[in-house]
């Protein structure tokens, strides 16, 4: 039994040494006389997948964003919960069309805001009547809602009171109100307050 084990270990060590020798020594192929070296990979290749998020995920991205994630994260978390889709050429085409549509809508909204701002600036001043007190004081104050009501009455335009920024008006006189119609478009209107 001992002789069988020793011959097995000898044959195994011989085959290992011959394999190790083949790796360390370059081999020449007879037809081209080129040196051939075997390539041995050190690490596994990371498997990364391209995805599009279906909803906002904290610390990862926003809805509609194109991301690279590891295959395991996609397979074990994102796909079972329905939070992402694997990118396909058709999906990329649809995403591009959706982006173009959104950009066109943003451009249209901005143009409408610019047109509305020009209209406000050509109007001149909006007049507000209040019951007068001593000197220049008025009873109460002029609020953003008052200005919104006046704009609706005079121009037949609905404006949200959240976009109207007025100084604190408690006296008669002329004031400048700012209307933030769009992140890039701001209109300034004059508000004249007088007592009856």
UniProtKB/Swiss-Prot annotation:
Annotated transit peptide: 1-41
Keywords: Chloroplast, Plastid, Ribonucleoprotein, Ribosomal protein, RNA-binding, rRNA-binding, Transit peptide
GO CC, one annotated term: ribonucleoprotein complex
Signal peptide residues on this chain, from the entry's feature table: none
InterPro entries: Ribosomal_bL9, Ribosomal_bL9/RNase_H1_N, Ribosomal_bL9_bac/chp, Ribosomal_bL9_C, Ribosomal_bL9_C_sf, Ribosomal_bL9_N, Ribosomal_bL9_N_sf
Subcellular locations according to the entry: Plastid, Chloroplast
GO molecular function list: rRNA binding; structural constituent of ribosome
Transit peptide keyword on record: yes
Major location (coarse): plastid
Keyword rRNA-binding appears in the UniProt entry: yes
Transmembrane segments: none
Pfam family, one: Ribosomal_L9_C
One GO biological process term: translation
Functional description taken from the UniProt entry: Component of the chloroplast ribosome (chloro-ribosome), a dedicated translation machinery responsible for the synthesis of chloroplast genome-encoded proteins, including proteins of the transcription and translation machinery and components of the photosynthetic apparatus.
Subunit composition and interactions: Component of the chloroplast large ribosomal subunit (LSU). Mature 70S chloroplast ribosomes of higher plants consist of a small (30S) and a large (50S) subunit. The 30S small subunit contains 1 molecule of ribosomal RNA (16S rRNA) and 24 different proteins. The 50S large subunit contains 3 rRNA molecules (23S, 5S and 4.5S rRNA) and 33 different proteins.
NCBIfam families: L9
Homology family: Belongs to the bacterial ribosomal protein bL9 family.
The protein, known as: Large ribosomal subunit protein bL9c
Species classification: Eukaryota, Viridiplantae, Streptophyta, Embryophyta, Tracheophyta
């Amino acid at each position: 039994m001992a002789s069988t084990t020793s011959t097995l270990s000898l044959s195994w060590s011989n085959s290992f040494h011959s394999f190790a020798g083949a790796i360390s020594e370059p081999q020449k192929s007879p037809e081209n006389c080129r040196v051939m070296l075997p390539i041995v990979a050190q690490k596994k290749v990371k498997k990364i997948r391209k995805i599009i998020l279906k909803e906002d995920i904290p610390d990862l991205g926003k809805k509609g964003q194109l991301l690279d994630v590891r295959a395991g994260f996609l397979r074990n978390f994102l796909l079972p919960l329905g939070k992402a889709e694997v990118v396909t050429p058709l999906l990329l085409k649809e995403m591009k069309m959706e982006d173009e549509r959104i950009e066109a809508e943003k451009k249209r909204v901005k143009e409408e805001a610019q047109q509305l701002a020009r209209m406000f600036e050509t109007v001149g001043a909006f007049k507000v009547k209040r019951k007068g007190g001593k000197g220049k004081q008025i009873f109460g104050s002029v609020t953003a809602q008052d200005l919104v009501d006046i704009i609706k009455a005079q121009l037949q335009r609905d404006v949200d009171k959240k976009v109207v920024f007025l100084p604190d008006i408690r006296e008669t006189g002329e004031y400048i109100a700012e209307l933030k119609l769009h992140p890039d478009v701001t209109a300034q209107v004059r508000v004249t307050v007088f007592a009856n």
